[in-house]
Swiss-Prot record:
SUBUNIT field: Homodimer. Interacts with PriA and DnaT. Component of the replication restart primosome. Primosome assembly occurs via a 'hand-off' mechanism. PriA binds to replication forks, subsequently PriB then DnaT bind; DnaT then displaces ssDNA to generate the helicase loading substrate.
Gene Ontology molecular function terms on file: single-stranded DNA binding
Name listed for the protein in its UniProt record: Replication restart protein PriB
Gene name of this polypeptide: priB
Keywords: DNA replication, DNA-binding, Primosome
Length: 100
């Protein structure tokens, strides 16, 4: 069964945690993203505000480790936060500074 799991958001990098490395030497950067926008739902305007944990792997992790407070556009997919937690975490595959 092949369901789509694609997320695209304009967000603020609210918090950046210290970079870490897997045993294989792959950089891992965990961040908290903050989003706020007005969306239409059932014909009414609805204010959407959320924070979501996210993870960047590889070279991009090293590039973004000092970018707290920057607005970005991210694309990725939702996955479980850990083996023990089914809470969602955005796994970022593409990240670019948001130019508005």
């Amino acid at each position: 069964m092949g369901f789509n799991n694609l997320v695209s958001l304009a967000v603020l990098i609210e918090k950046v945690f210290p970079i870490r490395y897997t045993p294989a030497g792959i950089p891992v950067l965990d961040i908290i993203l903050k989003h706020e926008s007005w969306q239409e739902e059932n014909g009414q305007q609805c204010l959407v505000q959320l924070e979501i944990p996210a993870r960047i792997l590889g070279r991009q992790a090293e590039e973004w480790q000092y970018r707290q407070g920057v607005y970005v556009h991210v694309e990725g997919f939702l996955a479980q936060k850990s083996r023990r937690s089914l809470m969602p975490m955005l796994r970022i595959q593409n990240i670019q500074e948001y130019k508005g």
